[in-house]
Amino acid sequence: MFNIFKRKSKEVQSDLAKPQETEPFFEEKKTLFLRFKEGLSKTKEKLAQTLAEVFEVDRLITQADLEEIEESLILSDLGVETTFALLEPIKRDLSLGKNITSKELKNRLREGLLNLLVDPTRPLPSQGIPATLFFLGVNGVGKTTTIAKLAKNFKDGGYRVLMVAGDTFRAGAIEQLQRWGERVGVPVYAQKEGADPASVIYQGLDKAIKEGFELVLIDTAGRLHTKYNLMEELKKMTRVIEKFIPQEGYENILVLDANTGQNAISQAESFFKAIPIHSVILTKMDGTAKGGVAFAISNKFKLPIRFIGLGEKPEDLLPFDKESFVKAILPE
C-alpha cells in the first residue's frame, strides 16, 4: 500500500492490495510513520498530558483514570459514541473487580483504536478501464486541491491520468482545476461554466477510454450538504459513470476537513444517504488537534480512510496506514 502511486504491471494488478514484506516495504512504512508522527503532533499533544499522567509508571488503573481518558478522547473528537465503544469493555472489567495495569490499559487502547479503523477491501486504483475516482465533499474541504495532488502523485508513478471538471457551478472551479492541471502536468477535461455536470462526466469518460487514459479523477460541486438538488445531481453522475465503468471499477471518495471535527460526521451522513461512499480522505490533519475524527468516521460508517493530508505539497498527501496512525498519537 505504501507504493500505491506506482503503476503496476498487468501481471501484478491482482496483488495491489497485498504489500510485499520486503526491506523496501519496511523502510517505506518507517518513513510513513515518521511523517505521521510529525504531522499529527497537535492531536498527540491533545492526548499527551492526560495519558502521560496515567502511563508514567506501571500501576493499577482506577475508574477516575478512565474518566480522564474518556474526556481527553472526546475532546480529540473521537466522539461520545466511538469513545464509549472503545472504553466500555475496560470499564466493565474494572467494575467486575479485575485488576488492569497502566501497561495493559495502553495495549488495550492501542488494540481498540486499531480495531476502530476499517481496512480497505479492494485495491486503489481499482480494476476499471479506466480506473475512476469520483470525489465528493462540501466546499472548502480541499477537494479540488486533493484531486490535483493525487493526480500528480499517480502521474509521477507512471499512470496516464485525466482530471474531469465536474464542478460546473462554483465560480472559478473549472479555472482552478485547469491551473492545477498546468501546475502538475495532468490534462483536464472541462466544458463551460454552468454545463450539465453529468454531460461533462460522460464526455470526459468517453475521452479517457478512446485516448487510453488509465486513471480518471472527477471533481464535483460542493455546495452545502443540506441542498437536496446537489444530492440528486450526484446520483445522476454516478449513473453516468456506470454506463462506462462497472461498480467494482470506480470508487466514490468523500473528502472531509479534519478541522471540522464532529461536523464532518453530519456531512458524511448526508452524502451517505444519497449515494454509496466507498472511502474517505481527511484533509488538513496537520493543523488540528481533532485527529480523533478519523476513528469516529471509520467506525461509524465502516469506511476505510484512503489518504490524509499533512501539508500543502502533493507529497504531503499520504496513504493512510492505521498502524502508523495509532502509533503516532499513542506511542509505545
Predicted features by range, described:
Residues M1-R122, G128-F134, D156, V161:
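Non-catalytic terminal/linker segments enriched in charged/polar, low-complexity residues
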Residues L114-L116, R122-E332:
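P-loop/Walker A NTP-binding module and the surrounding RecA-like catalytic core of P-loop NTPases
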